[in-house]
UniProtKB/Swiss-Prot annotation:
Record organism: Homo sapiens
Regions crossing the membrane: 5-25, 49-69, 85-105, 142-162, 182-202, 238-258
PROSITE patterns: SOLCAR
Membrane topology value: Multi-pass membrane protein
UniProt-annotated location(s): Mitochondrion inner membrane
Protein name listed in UniProt: Mitochondrial S-adenosylmethionine carrier protein
Tissue distribution of the protein: Widely expressed. Highly expressed in testis, with moderate expression in brain, heart, kidney, lung, skeletal muscle, pancreas, small intestine and liver, and low expression in spleen.
Length: 274
């Protein structure tokens, strides 16, 4: 990948990430509180809906930028084989690699954010300090495995579906999709991926919010899912599915649309620059 492409992916990914995380933060808070062990009301209900937003604001740009740099680089690296039937597989591999890298940044931000969302009266920096004091760096990476196990299946569904919908729309209208059309494809892809991966999101939330030293905090996703199934059934496994779908559908519209638009503009500026 050349330097203009690298810079375009870096900036476009970061801009898209910040836009989505800040605009849709209230929906994310509602989803987290619905999935929390203490239940929606005890976790804060609709009070302090922006609790934890500083953590999201700090982490969103580098997280999204890291994802898209990796995603675009792996797509470029695999481009040597132009077989069209392998294209979805390339997108899956690129998205999976992007998630593994991005989660190194996302998880600490997410841990602090989610604990703030269910403890609205506690300041974000205090939560960050408490985690470091009580659990060390390991505490900030609580749920890394469960986050990766959530994000990779999500990306395996979302990104190939997004790319396929764009390709189909481009073929139908005989020219490359516009930014708004890319955003619509992103909304459909994101909403569908969000729905089918909600149980993994529930497990990840429970692990992140668990008390240090508890069995849930160990991070065994299957064990957590089994526990939720036994205590709450299917409703527990899909807790927060509608706000999650709404947030990620809107997020897909904004995120992927903003990414495509910003990426195209930056590449165009790069071509015009001497």
């Amino acid at each position: 990948m050349d330097r203009p492409g690298f810079v375009a992916a870096l900036v476009a990914g970061g801009v898209a990430g910040v836009s989505v995380d800040l605009i849709l933060f209230p929906l994310d808070t509602i989803k987290t509180r619905l999935q929390s062990p203490q239940g929606f009301s005890k976790a804060g209900g609709f009070h302090g809906i922006y609790a934890g937003v500083p953590s999201a604001a700090i982490g969103s740009f580098p997280n999204a930028a890291a994802f898209f740099i990796t995603y675009e680089y792996v797509k470029w690296f695999l481009h040597a084989d132009s077989s069209s039937y392998l294209t979805p597989m390339k997108h899956m591999l690129a998205a999976s690699a992007g998630e593994v890298v991005a989660c190194l940044i996302r998880v600490p931000s997410e841990v602090v954010k989610q604990r703030a969302q269910v403890s609205a009266s506690t300041r974000t920096f205090q939560i960050f300090s408490n985690i470091l004091y009580e659990e060390g760096i390991q505490g900030l990476y609580r749920g890394y495995k469960s986050t990766v196990l959530r994000e990779i299946p999500f990306s395996l569904v979302q990104f190939p579906l997004w790319e396929s919908l764009k390709a189909l729309w481009s073929w139908r209208q005989d020219h490359v999709v516009d930014s708004w059309q890319s955003a619509v494809c992103g909304a459909f892809a994101g909403g569908f991926a969000a729905a089918v991966t909600t149980p993994l999101d529930v497990a990840k939330t429970r692990i992140t919010l668990a008390k240090a030293g508890s069995s849930t905090a160990d991070g065994n996703v299957l064990s957590v899912l089994h526990g939720v199934w036994r205590s709450q059934g299917l409703a527990g496994l899909f807790a927060g599915v509608f706000p999650r779908m709404a947030a990620i559908s809107l997020g897909g519209f904004i995120f992927l649309g903003a990414y495509d638009r910003t990426h195209s503009l930056l590449l165009e500026v790069g071509r015009k620059s001497p």
